[in-house]
Amino acid sequence: MGHLTGLGSAVCKLSKMFFRLGICLSLLFPCIATSGQEIAITMKSGLVLEGLAGTIDEISVTLERPDAFGQKQIVLMDNGLTRTYVSKRDIANKGDSSLSSTELDIWQRTAGGQKGHGILLDIGPFDEHGHRTIWVRDTTNRRVPIVQGITKLNPKWVEVEALVNPNGGNRNWTMRLATSSLPPNVLRNMLHRTINDPKNAVQRMEVVEFYVEAEQYRRAIEELTQIERDLPDARDNFKQDRQRLRQQYGRNVLDEIRFRDSVGQRELARAMAGAIDVADMAGQLQADFLDFQQQSIATEKRIENAKKELIGRCQKYIAAHDDQPAQQDALQQLIEEVGSDLRPTNLNRLSSYARLINDNTKTEGQLLSLALSGWIMGSSNVTENFAESESLFLVRNLVSEYLAPAPSARRVQILKELEKYELSQPVHLSAILFNLLPPQAPELGDLYKPGDVKYTGEHPLEFEVTVKGPKAHGGKPIKFNYLVHLPPQYDPYRKYPLLLTLRSGNSVEEQLERWAGQYNPKLGLRGIRNGPAMRHGYIVASLDWKQEGQSIYEYSAREHKAILSCMRAMLRKFSIDSDRVFLTGHGFGAEAAYDVAISHPDQFAGVVGIAGKIGKYPNQYFDNQHLGLNVYSVVGEKDLLSISASANCWNKWLNGRLFNRCMVVEYQGRLTESFREEFGNILNWCDLQRRKWPAFGEPVSIDCELLRPWDNYYWFIEYHGLPLQNQVLPAAWPANGRGFNSINISAKMPRDNTFLNVKPAKAGGGITIWLAPEYIDFTKKVSVAPRGGGFKDFVKPSREILLEDVRKRADRKRPFWAKIDLN
């Protein structure tokens, strides 16, 4: 945290916060004091957590005293607001913590009595006294209003307690909320209640220091300005403090500008940089702002120069080669696309061309072939052979038509036409697919171009997916609607992360706005919403996955199809990095998210469950052996239903050597809530996660239990015809959750990536092994046993298999090139 100099630094000596560290995951015991250290830990992913640290054996409803970062495997980090549980094996290093020790007491008439328990129904706003009303359904099923008041302030958290009820029936409802979640006027009023003498500069500066430690620098400057107005005689004493505040505020803004630029919001970042007055900032900070602006200008100039040079070279070649109409047509199309679409996100496609542009040993045709092939296939897949590359636009157009999608008969024709072109082999098609714009993109205009915008961000985009209904109801198609918001300055040439979110009892619109935020027309830029997902540059889709009247998650094929179909539709419509797809949900939307992601871990970079339980099938699949799934769970301390249902999976993942990487965040004293204050932390975590995928030269081991016919594929192994005696459908789920006659599918591949051990050897209708160059060497024979009777042969990549795989799975980043069908 920053600290003030001058008068402010001499007076801000506030009480050391008394931390408590404990499990507090049940109603059976209170928080437990511990001898834990206040430290910062850095996870292997790069995520940093701070707080008092201790270790425990397991998350449990039984009493356990944490060790002070001892030998136990589950590490607990208490920062006063939350307790975060991580696995010791996932920690890279630890260091000193910078958490603030400031704690201010606010007097309120608090209630005593036993701890209150119930289900949260509604939350009212805070008034000017720091009071709010929550409504809970108590153990007698009554709707009970409870008035709470703010009693403690810390730069990271505030504590609220139940106030005295004059009608009796007092209960202790103590909760911790994020300080950042308080409305600014409420926080200011509470801080000013700690001031006994408004003319006392020492007391007034304590408020400024609080804002600084809370990293609310604009509020700190506003508070200091008010102090200077109220105490003009002491104004000169604050000069050094004001300068330091301006520096901290400016550095904070610059960090935000750079972050926005890094997630693809260049226009917004430039507007922010141009709007701030740097005149009274120190020289280095001024230089940093100037450097950012100059880099932006230099990038634009580099793009304009690249356009001018390449277009000029193309035009000269066209004029001099009337005998090459195919090359002329290709270059004319290149001129149009480069002139219209060249930008920072695709400039690297021309890097091979730019690197050799002054090489006198290259002919004009070779150089233009480098530019053309780089533009369509990427700079790492270029060719100097213009006779081959001249057909690339034709090949790309056929691929786009195939995925449009074309009718079945036309797809057969396209495959035949592709055979004519040298650069239509699977290796070339894979490169084209990766660099292809979304094949079913909606008509948005180009958010990157002023005056060409049909989506402004004010209203969501609306779509629907259709899935086949259950046979019991005649297989009638069922439609599911979903809403989409795009991040500011969405650019189809950039690959974005996707957040697919599932509602609970709220509306699909409300679920979308939780992540995307509200529209801000005052910013004057296209597509600006103020939600955390927009800030981080995520595309957000909110799926109305439930049928009318549905009040619980049913673990059905219909629900899985709806969610996975929505994800694939998004991959077809928008420019999405398929290694950065996250499934999240609230309440029983979280229950759905856990089930779908844990059953299909190869589809997602991570799953985020908020105030929901890990239920039936995931509790059977928790020890499936595979490449791993990243799991982020958020619960309230008093949400015992979610905790008791999920603890088995959490403990196995945190404590054992299993394959899912898990983090559990528990909000102190809280019930079943939306936990919006956690969204920024969730997205910080998402930023660091990627989908796990087999890699060449690394051993792969998959061994997964199957209970439902639609849980039949993991990465590259797909099982067909799950025997009836091995199925446990949702309607037949045993009451005790036991007695399963499940079957496992497995595929093990050593480092040489030429042999696959595939099981079961006989049961079921067959197994398909899907192959890709990331983990298979197609120049060597592939052996498979015991399934398939000892298959050993070369496997040839196929255009049809590749394009059909992309048409069905919509994953243009990691398509399969070939397959082996085993009876």
Task: Give the positions of each predicted feature.
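Compositionally biased alpha-helical segments
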Residues: 35-333, 337
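Short beta-strand element of the alpha/beta-hydrolase
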Residues: 494-505
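Primarily recognizes the serine-hydrolase "nucleophile elbow" in alpha/beta-hydrolase
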Residues: 579-625
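Alpha/beta-hydrolase active-site loop
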Residues: 553-574
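C-terminal catalytic histidine-bearing segment of alpha/beta-hydrolase fold enzymes
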Residues: 640, 644-754, 762
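A domain-start/cap signature at the N-terminus of enzymes
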Residues: 304-496, 805-807, 811
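Short beta-strand/loop motif that positions the catalytic acidic residue
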Residues: 633-635
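C-terminal beta-sandwich/jelly-roll accessory domains of carbohydrate-active enzymes
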Residues: 708-751, 755-823
